[in-house]
Swiss-Prot record:
Chief location category: secreted
Keyword annotations of the record: Cholesterol metabolism, HDL, Lipid metabolism, Lipid transport, Repeat, Secreted, Signal, Steroid metabolism, Sterol metabolism, Transport
Protein function: Participates in the reverse transport of cholesterol from tissues to the liver for excretion by promoting cholesterol efflux from tissues and by acting as a cofactor for the lecithin cholesterol acyltransferase (LCAT).
Similarity field: Belongs to the apolipoprotein A1/A4/E family.
Name of this chain's protein: Apolipoprotein A-I
Annotated region described as 10 X approximate tandem repeats, given as residue ranges: 67-264
GO biological process, one term: negative regulation of very-low-density lipoprotein particle remodeling
GO molecular function ontology, one term from the record: high-density lipoprotein particle receptor binding
Length: 264
């Protein structure tokens, strides 16, 4: 129970911002968010594209053109997947650089939170002991009443209600006092910890967006290398796409010529 109280108390002091540190999650970098959004977008476009292609190919014009767009889409999807796979090492390189630059800040923040846990532990132990004592006293006071429940009449129910009400109200008030006392004991740590947490998280966010000159230089260098390595990959993708575009253009031209001959 004490471990649960410690965790809840720290989350109460710091807010949900500290969640990733207690769960030992790596903070999501801007690159992570961009990649996740890109993956979702590509999957959505792919699913929507298949539906549209299926409807088009089943139409009269689609059957006449016989473009086999579904097959071409699968080929293009494979090419796009290959491009994304080839980009993965470069993405990891930039991500690892960001994590390395923010490692010290994240370690400092974890240390601050651990120090606060140790400082508030005595208050939580005291709160837990008092709470347990109050509940036990309440249980003992109710034991005779529970015995009377075995033989109830309407009159006895009303009498028992009169007995229980003041006891329940007294216990409720005492437990509220314990919670209020705990809140007052933790209050001095709340402002300091929130300020430290906000400061550290702000520094991490700033590291995630290349603003410092040193970090800017690193990112520019990495992006320059990435652009050089990606150029042939993008060119290969464009070359894969060109035949399908030319095929579509030629078939449309043939269809227009056929329509003109029919109308002549």
């Amino acid at each position: 129970m004490r471990g649960v109280l410690v965790t809840l108390a720290v989350l109460f002091l710091t807010g949900t911002q500290a969640r990733s540190f207690w769960q030992h999650d790596d903070p999501q970098t801007p690159l992570d968010r961009i990649r996740d959004m890109l993956d979702v977008y590509l999957e959505t476009v792919k699913a929507s594209g298949k539906d549209a292609i299926s409807q088009f190919e089943s139409s009269a014009v689609g059957k006449q053109l016989d473009l086999k767009l579904a097959d071409n889409l699968d080929t293009l999807s494979a090419a796009a997947a290959k491009l994304r796979e080839d980009m993965t090492p470069y993405y990891r390189e930039v991500r690892e650089m960001w994590l390395k630059d923010t490692e010290a800040l994240r370690a400092e923040l974890t240390k601050d939170l651990e120090e606060v846990k140790e400082k508030i532990r005595p208050f939580l132990d005291q709160f837990s002991a008092k709470w347990t004592e109050e509940v036990e006293q309440y249980r003992q006071r109710l034991a005779p009443v529970a015995q009377e429940l075995k033989d109830l009449t309407k009159q006895k129910v009303e009498l028992m209600q009169a007995k229980l009400t003041p006891v329940a109200e007294e216990v409720r008030d005492r437990l509220r006092e314990q919670v209020e006392e705990l809140r007052k004991n933790l209050a001095p740590y709340s402002s300091e910890l929130r300020q430290k947490l906000s400061q550290k998280l702000e520094e991490i966010r700033e590291r995630g967006i290349p603003q410092a000159s040193e970090y800017q230089a690193k990112v520019v260098e990495q992006l320059s290398n990435l652009r050089e390595k990606m150029t042939p990959l993008v060119q290969e993708f464009k070359e894969r796409l060109t035949p399908y575009a030319e095929n579509l253009k030629n078939r449309l031209i043939d269809l227009l010529d056929e329509v003109q001959k029919t109308m002549a």
